[in-house]
Amino acid sequence: MPVYMILDAELHIAKPENAAAYDRYKEAAPEYVARHGGEYLCRGGAIDVEIGDWEPERVVMLKFPSRKAYDSFMVDPDYKPWKKLRESLSTIKKLVVLEGV
């Protein structure tokens, strides 16, 4: 059963060097997602909150073929340095993983 990961992040890229580092992350990350059968469904872009008071900054949605594939992505030792870089450049405000159909 597929799973979807949805996250809302606050970026800390006001400094040019941080923006450049985040650009490197954005270029590298899809390779590691794909290694585990994952794909990006959305990555940033315009957001319209239709109901509620949620104020997302940057929303990313990934699809993986299974929870096991998602979990293996999250602990991939090759992805670890990139994950650490992302963590230094952003704060994850919300992250959910849900089963698909």
Protein language model features and the residues they cover:
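Short S/T/G/P-rich N-terminal loop/turn motif that feeds into the first structured element of a domain
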Residues: 1-58, 65-71, 98-101
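Charged, low-complexity, helix-prone segments enriched in Lys/Glu/Asp/Gln
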Residues: 16-19, 85-86, 90
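A general structural signal for well-ordered secondary-structure junctions
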Residues: 39, 79-80, 92
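Generic beta-strand structural signal
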Residues: 58-60, 93-94
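Hydrophobic alpha-helical segments of small multi-pass membrane proteins
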Residues: 59-62, 78
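C-terminal structural segments of small proteins and small subunits
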Residues: 70-71, 78-88
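C-terminal end-helix/capping segment
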Residues: 87-101
